[in-house]
Amino acid sequence: YELAKMYRDGIGTQRDIGQAEAHFQNAFSGFFSLEADSHDDKLQYRLGQMLHTGTGTGKDDTAAAHYWECAARLGNVNAQYALGKLWLENGTGDPEQAVAWITKAAESGNAAAQYALGKVYRDGIHVPRDMEKAVELFTQSAEQDNEYAAYQLGKLYLAGEDIPKDVEAAIRW
């Protein structure tokens, strides 16, 4: 997998998309074989990523969701976030379960999940709108250097429509 990325990105070698694709296909086959024996959450997450993006295999969000759900149930925070996000974005899973997976990942400190959940509460998507909770989540995410969350905080504090206007906080974020 790492060799495929090196060929794809031209790191330590000349960029060669054909070689990269061949190595990604080998990696996918290897991960698939290993996962069948081990049921390792990291392999399941990686297989889900590869299926979601079509890297080394055909793009298949249904299969990606399957692997992510297996990994999520084993406690893989990245899979919890990826599964919840996929279900919310393409409308294929139970929206309440999607929010529950993102919440679980956010509570485990995943900055991307905190940002995504902040948007869910800001916009009232499948949950009651709660700006206080949204700001709390955006802040947790921004404190982990998530630039998107920092931008949202800056916008919210500058506008002062849903939270008290605070120009200093807007500038800080």
Please report, for each region that a protein language model flagged, where it lies by residue:
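TPR/TPR-like (Sel1-like) alpha-helical repeat modules
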Residues: 18-29, 168-173
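Glutamine-centric residue-chemistry signal
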Residues: 19, 25, 44, 74, ...
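Short helix-capping/linker turns of helical repeat alpha-solenoids
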Residues: 9-11, 16, 30-33, 37-40, ...
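Hydrophobic/aromatic packing residues within the alpha-helices of TPR/SEL1-like helical repeat arrays
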Residues: 24, 31-32, 68, 102, ...
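Hydrophobic face of amphipathic alpha-helices that form TPR/SEL1-like repeat modules
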Residues: 2-9, 30, 44-53, 57, ...
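Repeat-mediated protein-protein interaction surfaces in helical alpha-solenoids
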Residues: 28-36, 98, 134
